[in-house]
A protein has these predicted regions:
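Short hydrophobic/Thr-rich beta-strand motif most characteristic of the beta2 strand and flanking loop
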Residues: 1-3, 10, 161
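Acidic catalytic/metal-coordinating carboxylates
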Residues: 3-6, 29-32
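Conserved phosphotransfer cores of two-component systems
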Residues: 12-16, 36-44, 64, 174
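Active-site residues of response regulator receiver
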Residues: 22, 50
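The feature encodes the CheY-like receiver
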Residues: 26, 54
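Short, flexible helix-to-coil linker/hinge segments that flank and couple to helix-turn-helix
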Residues: 56-63, 67-119, 123, 176-177
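Helix-turn-helix DNA-binding segment
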Residues: 111-146
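Recognition helix of helix-turn-helix DNA-binding domains
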Residues: 133-166
Length: 178
């Protein structure tokens, strides 16, 4: 599918054993698309493919209902293994993500500022950092610009940032934008 809307439509209209879903879709965040697919077909396994850092997006994808998360740079090595594992009823995480999760368990429970954000606040952060206006973000998330403004205010407060320039700098420095 070339878009979130098309992916959701195809899943609703057809029967699939498994869905491979790109986290970066042109019309909507892949995590939001995943949530919609899981609302429609909760038992359908979905493996997320992404070019984004696993430690940033892998956990969010798994929490949203993904059965697996594969980074595109290693997809040729891991995809067959991931599909087999998910089709056998288990979840799949890459060795790199497993290592990151194990390391974080041993570290202090202090989270990085962006890890405190809700999914919508996180989406807002990424889109603001990418240069989108409040109106463009509202259209992308199918919400009002006023709601986007509330998300922006919350993320600024939670992350102790002052403006969109600081948001963009933070997102770039932490690998949260393309």
């Amino acid at each position: 599918a070339g878009s979130s809307a098309e992916a959701v439509r195809l899943v609703r209209e057809n029967t699939y054993d498994l869905v491979l879903l790109d986290i970066s879709l042109p019309d909507k965040n892949g995590i939001e698309t995943l949530k919609q697919i899981k609302r429609d077909k909760p038992a359908l396994p979905v493996i997320m493919l992404s070019m984004h850092a696993e430690d940033e997006f892998g956990v969010r994808a798994l929490k949203a209902g993904a059965s697996g998360y594969v980074h595109k740079k290693s997809a040729h090595e891991q995809l067959v293994v991931a599909i087999r594992q998910v089709m056998s009823g288990r979840r799949y995480i890459s060795p790199d993500l497993a290592e990151e999760l194990a390391r974080s368990v041993g570290e202090s429970s202090e989270k990085r500022p962006h890890e405190l954000l809700s999914d919508r606040e996180f989406d807002t952060l990424r889109m603001l950092a990418g240069g989108k206006s409040l109106t463009e973000i509202a259209e992308s998330l199918s919400i009002s610009p006023k709601t986007v403004s509330v998300y922006r205010a919350r993320l600024l407060e939670k992350m102790k940032l002052k403006n969109n320039a600081e948001i963009a700098h933070y997102a770039f420095k932490n690998g949260l934008i393309d």
